[in-house]
Structures are given as C-alpha cells and as structure tokens.
Amino acid sequence: DNTKAYSEAMKYFIIFALFIFLGVMFYIDILKYFVGPAYYPGLRVVPIVMLGELFFGIYFNLSLWYKLIDQTRWGAYFSTIGCVATVSIILLFGPSYGYMACAWASFFCNLLMMLLSYFVGQKKFPIEYDLKSAFLYFGVATVLYVAGMALPIQSEWLRLGYRTILLGVFIAFMVKRDLPLRELPYVGRFFR
C-alpha cells in the first residue's frame, strides 16, 4: 500500500522541517553574520518566511494525489488561488507594511494552498496522514520556539546554551517517539 509510504514521508518531512526551523531560529544570532549588518532589521521575517516555506513543502508533498489520478489541473487551480491571495495581500498591505506584508503574504498563500490541497485531496484520493503526530510536533516546536525566544537572556553564550538545551529536548522527543535508534544495527547498541 503506497499510501502508507506517502503518509510516512509526510510525517518525517514535517519532523525534520520543524527541526531545521528550530535550529535556524535558535542560532539566528550566529547565522546573521552570514549577511551584512544592513540586513539585520530584516531578520524578523525569517520565522514567517520559514513557516511559509514549510507549508509550501507540505503542499508539495500533498500534491502527489492529483498527479496519481491524472488531474494535474488541480495544481493550476491551487497555484492561481495562491497567486491571487499573495498579490492581494501585497497590494493591500504592502504600501503600509513593506516587506513584512510580503512575508505574511507568502505565509498565508502557502498555508491556503496546503489546506486546499489537503481537503480536496482527501475527497479525490484519500491518504490517511498522521495528523495527530503532525499537530503534536507543531505544538512541541511552538512551545520550544516561544520558550527560546520569549526569555530575555542578555548573555549571548547563555542564550545559545539555553536554546541548545531546548533543541536537545526536541531531538530527544523526536528520537524517543519516532526514530527507533535501538533498531539500527551499529547505533542501536548505545540505545538499549
């Protein structure tokens, strides 16, 4: 049954995408040195854009259904709706909010296309995705992200240490729940 494989692929995509999101956001204080200081004020769009791209990745995974049933026109429908949503948000809010409006436009466009593809796909070619795990991981990542960003730690080293611990919590949760390392031939002996 290939639908099980599609469901598993989606689950692990979400897990690792959230891990990357947390990693980038927790170490943004270091990663910012890869761009010039003139761009530092724009770093506030990074979490919005990253989540928007995560939604686009989920949409891309979901788009499999209309290819499998040879109804690729649905991709054109979703893309057109997403384009109209993006342009509308930018035209309405761009003059007042600048690049923040563009970031939010991308976020909402990708979220909308993801939701449309999921709900239409469940009617046309149902795949039983592990929504419980997806929401659980989004919830854990949200709590850890808020915990990592909300606590005002002045010392950069202490802040990075604290965020590293939080990222470790996510990794431990991921390993304990969905990555059975004990079943791997060589690595497994360390996790018995």
Which residues are covered by each model-predicted region?
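Membrane-embedded alpha-helical segments of multi-pass transporters/permeases
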Residues: 21-29, 87, 91-92, 114-122, ...
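Specific pore-lining/lateral-gate transmembrane helices of multi-pass inner-membrane transport
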Residues: 1-79
